[in-house]
Amino acid sequence: MAGSSSSKEIVDAVEKWMAFPTSGGGGATAGLEIVAEDAPSGSSGAHQQQAWRPVAPATAGRDSGGTGSGKSSVDGGVGRASHDSLPRVSQELKDALSSLQQTFVVSDATRPDCPIIYASEGFFTMTGYSPREVVGRNCRFLQGPDTDAAEVAKIRDAVKHGRSFCGRLLNYRKDGAPFWNLLTVTPIRDDNGKVIKFIGMQVEVSKYTEGLSDKRMRPNELPVSLIRYDERQKDKAMSSMTEVVQTVKQPRGARAPADAALLTPPKMSDADKMAAMSPVVAPGTPSGGGGGAGSFKSPLWDLKKEESRLSRLASGRKSGRSSLMGFKIGKRSSVGSREAPAVVEEPAPAPPPAPEVVERTDSWERAEREKDIRQGIDLATTLERIEKNFVITDPRIPDNPIIFASDSFLELTEYTREEILGRNCRFLQGPETDQGTVDKIREAIREQKEITVQLINYTKSGKKFWNLFHLQPMRDQKGELQYFIGVQLDGSDHVEPLRNRLSENTEIQSAKLVKATAENVDDAVRELPDANLRPEDLWAIHSMRVSPKPHKRNNPSWIAIEKATNLGEKIGLKHFKPVKPLGCGDTGSVHLVELQGSGELFAMKAMDKSVMLNRNKVHRACIEREIYALLDHPFLPTLYTSFQTPTHVCLITDFCPGGELFAVLDRQPMKIFREECARFYAAEVVIGLEYLHCLGIIYRDLKPENILLQADGHIVLTDFDLSFLTTSKPHVIKNSTSLKRRRSQEFLPPTFVSEPSTPSNSFVGTEEYIAPEVITGAGHTSAIDWWALGILLYEMLYGRTPFRGKNRKKTFYNILHKDLTFPSSIPVSLAAKQLIHGLLQRDPSNRIGSNAGANDIKQHSFFQDINWPLIRCMSPPELDVPLKLIGKETQPKAKPDEDVPLNLDTF
């Protein structure tokens, strides 16, 4: 009992530290609210809550019982308003909404039962109901016997309190057929903050969700599925919802969406797949070339060219961290204008922004879009972006079940992910499947060896296809069997009738392709933690001891840490006294803490274990811990210790009293730096990135929020949860000298270059800073960090990023296609524009830094006044608004000897 009590005390202590209130049923969706122009007469919160209560089932063709649904007829049934009293929407709004491709409804929150006042065409197609059966009714008619009542309760609670919601629940079509619906609910408020409408966006995810398979557990109590898909789908849904919300807010500004191909990757025929033998990670032009059949592709691969345009809106923006903290940093402008393609020597003319435009802030842009636009996004691992037919099975679980299936495999076989996760692959067999070939596969599994065979398999509908199947075992670092990788290739179009099998030449070429795919899958899976690890072993690296590195081992912080460890205790949460919160992100928080009895201040990053598990970020957290342990550089943070609690993992690093560069930039006149200041900060970023690349680290999340300022004004790059760690490839480039230099006996020394050796293809980064090759899925190298440097320099000089759009899809389109322009209203040197232009080359091979790494950039004329070897000894240029240091003294005064409590309301 004593042990149990002690454990409870630990958990309670952790909860007191870290139990930040969530944003409601919708998690990250709570920020998606907008302010409308006009405020109709309102209704009480009770009416809104009532809108989501289940009613007795009465729909024809639907099984009775369970959660039930309302009537589908247009009579005066439950939840049905009379036809004459139905709320109306303006024709202008109808026209604007009809241009959207999303499936959604708009409900009137000011009327009892929140009746639907508009439903998109996609909603009728998805559900099978007619407009007459939908408009004027509450959405509960989609519920049925197996709809999760707990999820419905979450929706009801979100509606009652005027919050957003995003979750997956089982709904039913008019004919009674069930489908998985990813529902996103967002409130629309009037100028007084009262909810007047709700938007409910539906995305059918039956094909790709794990469904009830997420309840299947391994012996280690972790899910059978290697990837958790719900959070992936929620992230995509939230991005799509922004366009709907913006259209409701500003119907006049709505335009017909681009072609559907914007969101649909090109499908290749199997003949093309077998004919194209390019490697899976291939260099290519971000505008669409270089992909080949073997390239990674993303949902935005085939973006089509359209007229480049910028909205002439001004918008405020907030730091990704500070917006969640509630800090009032001030307004930032984002003024765009239609400009000609950028010519560095002669920047296109642009009218100077009018003061009233700069100061005006649109409610959506300022209050909602800003809450997530600067957050790092993690949309897919490299494994998920391999567009080939393959599965991964785990032989350590009985019956060797499937733990991962690619989207392409689902398309080929017609099965849903829910139907195959946790099952053995034998469901593909049928009447004409050769049992002798099946026996060969079974023997290869027993002997743990690879094999390539061809056999007849069957889709879910019974259609047979010739499957060129490659089985390859995957072993861990100890050489023990970990997984099997099974790659399929449909060769039905290449079967020779007389031989009743694939032609010899096709078989040879196809075998090469499936083996290459298996190798790429093998590499990609190794980025993820072993699914068979015990939960406590997942975080083992955070309990490892941290040893001081040479350059900082004698600084006061390390002396204080070692003094504490010399007492024989392992440092943990109890050794630190909370001072105040510094920031909060989507997976954790950062606190200013003091080491008990030392007076030394540190930054503590705390990450919620359950959130990391649900969002497929365990490997990200472990890689970040591994990277921190490698660093020993004045422009990078020092890791002093790390530990875990029952609910969190924590990193103790340097506290930077200068705060984020973002906040410093925001306080400057016009929200920009003078060029000498921008040059200094950019130069130190180059030095930091050069060091990271030398260690084999691709940073992947450079932005002002992740650049902290030390007390002396020098920078520290922080946050490595999206970084990629591989090996580096050092080499020396001999510089050729000109005749003039040879005559004067001035010889250039050789150049040392060390860049990460292995490309990656994870879809990670921050929306405005993501490089084109990340979006297209062509595979990326450390060159993406130099792209981000170009965006950073542009933002420091112009107060905005060059490719930002009104939503994520538009931003990504701009990154791939929009011309780079330089507003003439802000004076910037030609050298700066040339450097930005060179860094923002869409083809990575043409980008400055792609050949000799940081050396290319350091030699640019923009940095000619920088003394690179002595930059850490330089005094930073004076800012127009001086650096304001933060620390214990900035906390509101407390009584003597009284601990300053954490203000949990900040989160």
Curated annotation (Swiss-Prot):
GO terms for biological process: circadian rhythm; phototropism; stomatal movement. It is an enzyme of class 2 (transferase). ATP binds at L582, G583, C584, G585, D586, T587, G588, S589, V590, K605. Coiled coil: none annotated. SUPFAM superfamilies: Protein kinase-like (PK-like), PYP-like sensor domain (PAS domain). Its cofactor is FMN. Residues 28-84, 332-363 are annotated as: Disordered. Its EC number is 2.7.11.1. Residues 41-51 have a biased composition (Polar residues). Expressed at low levels in leaves of dark-grown seedlings. Autophosphorylated in response to blue light irradiation. 2 molecules of FMN bind covalently to cysteines after exposure to blue light and are reversed in the dark. Keywords: ATP-binding, Chromophore, Flavoprotein, FMN, Kinase, Nucleotide-binding, Photoreceptor protein, Receptor, Repeat, Sensory transduction, Serine/threonine-protein kinase, Transferase. Binds 2 FMN per subunit. The active site is at D701 (proton acceptor). The PAS (PER-ARNT-SIM) domains are required for the binding of FMN chromophores. Undergoes a photocycle characterized by fluorescence and absorption changes induced by blue light. Protein kinase that acts as a blue light photoreceptor in a signal-transduction pathway for phototropic responses. Regulates a wide range of physiological activities in plants that maximize the efficiency of photosynthesis, such as chloroplast relocations, stomata opening, and leaf expansion. This is Phototropin-2. The gene is PHOT2.
